[in-house]
Amino acid sequence: MFRYLSKRQWILLLLGILFVVAGYFILPVSVPLIIALITALFLNPAVRWMQFRFRLNRKMAVTIVFLLFVIMIGLLGTYAVTRAVTQLVELADNAPSYINQINNVLINWQNNMNSFTQNMPSEFVDKVSVELQNTIDTTTQTLSQKLQLSNIAAFAAKIPEYLISFLVYLIALFLFMLELPRLKDKMHGNFTESTSEKVKFMNARLSYVVFGFLKAQFLVSIVIFVVCLIGLFWITPEVAIVMSLIIWIVDFVPIIGSIVILGPWALYMLIVGDIAMGGQLAMLAIILLAIRRTVEPKVMGRHIGLSPLATLIAMYIGLQLIGLMGFILGPLLVIAFNSAKEAGIIRWNFKL
């Protein structure tokens, strides 16, 4: 099939391969800059609206939008850290009672197991007991290794590095927001008029699809939030609003879903002996999963024109290649490729 490729297509193919290889090594160390560029692209419509609505120059509009964005991030971060510290303190205070509850459940299980295995062969009972003890020992050893003071200290030692990355992100974001029009002009200056029109079409299509993807995720997550809020008000009204907000935020991330919160919560309630609440939480998780799997493909197909299978494959491959950043870049690359085909930049019309 390669003999049907023209010289221009060979050049584009080689450039694409070089771009992928370079990206594989460069992307992991340039995550703050890439996130800053993507954020600047998302905030650019707000900057243009400020310029049009209030007759401001580019620098003043960028400064206002940037400050509003930083204030929003600061408020959300402060709230998240405060809630996390509060929950950790409550967990530490209630840890003895949690341990006692789990011990009581384990004692009840052991008593039930002893009464259940009275008529069984002693060899079988001994084998099961040994396997259970090995599992408990392995789990305890793993938890002990993860919770060692050295690991906690190593994580704390990386906090300055994270702060530096965040500072680089903020500085790069402000500069990208200022320089976006100039960067676009320089990029289009390297193209012919025909190619420039195709690139503009691809950018417009890509922007439409990306915002459509975010809109679709938001619409699906709103449905999830309403159903989750109603269900939790019926199951545990004391924490219904807070947990619904947490589940809504987590569910906004593709693939992860509400099961990440409701699954462990239901399992814990079953372990401590609250079978009714554990079963209700598990049922709510199943209902939310069914809603997402039913509604999401239709909403996604309507807003971005990318099949759920292609989205899943792109996310998984990107996640395996370059980590969390690939989880986002994977579908974007597929969308960019499809947009380039629609614009005529890439001609994929050969047949075997």
UniProtKB/Swiss-Prot annotation:
Record-linked InterPro entries: AI-2E-like, YtvI-like
KW Phosphoprotein (keyword) present: no
Topology class, membrane: Multi-pass membrane protein
Family the UniProt entry places it in: Belongs to the autoinducer-2 exporter (AI-2E) (TC 2.A.86) family.
Entry-linked Pfam families: AI-2E_transport (PF01594)
The keyword Secreted belongs to this UniProt entry's keyword annotation: no
Recorded superkingdom: Bacteria
Known role: Catalyzes the pH-dependent efflux of sodium and lithium in exchange for external protons.
Record GO cellular component, one term: plasma membrane
A GO BP entry: sodium ion transport
Compartments, as annotated in UniProt: Cell membrane
GO MF annotations in UniProt: antiporter activity
Cysteine pairings via disulfide bonds: none
Name of the protein: Sodium-lithium/proton antiporter
Transmembrane domains' residue ranges: 11-31, 32-52, 61-81, 159-179, 216-236, 241-261, 271-291, 317-337
pH dependence, entry free text: Optimum pH is 9.0.
Subcellular location, principal: membrane
Keywords attached to this entry: Antiport, Cell membrane, Ion transport, Membrane, Sodium, Sodium transport, Transmembrane, Transmembrane helix, Transport
